[in-house]
């Protein structure tokens, strides 16, 4: 008797995480492959899209640096967050401050935060 894809999916869905990890390890051993290799190869397929000009950028706070108070003030001004929310965001670095902004806005925000003492990355 051959199992359908639906039956296989249902069988896997009923397993615990530990059982699934053991299943993956057994499949890797039986077929001589690694799940990590398949995951690493996947981004290569999207390489053509990355060659296009990027129009939207994300501003990521990597660390607050030595002057955390100034960075919190800068984050509040840039995002419109309240004091507690801005403090929580700064303390949870690395964290996305803004997503999908123009290059000019991203660079301006990066400059403002770096002047306050933060380490910032534009992606």
UniProtKB/Swiss-Prot annotation:
Keywords: Ribonucleoprotein, Ribosomal protein. Disulfide bonds: none annotated. GO terms for cellular component: cytosolic large ribosomal subunit. One of its GO terms (molecular function) is structural constituent of ribosome. Transmembrane segments: none annotated. Pfam families: Ribosomal_L12, Ribosomal_L12_N. The keyword Ribonucleoprotein applies. Coiled coil: none annotated. One of its GO terms (biological process) is translation. CDD domains: Ribosomal_L7_L12 (cd00387). NCBIfam families: L12 (TIGR00855). Homodimer. Part of the ribosomal stalk of the 50S ribosomal subunit. Forms a multimeric L10(L12)X complex, where L10 forms an elongated spine to which 2 to 4 L12 dimers bind in a sequential fashion. Binds GTP-bound translation factors. Belongs to the bacterial ribosomal protein bL12 family. Forms part of the ribosomal stalk which helps the ribosome interact with GTP-bound translation factors. Is thus essential for accurate translation. This is Large ribosomal subunit protein bL12. It comes from Haemophilus influenzae (strain ATCC 51907 / DSM 11121 / KW20 / Rd). The gene is rplL.
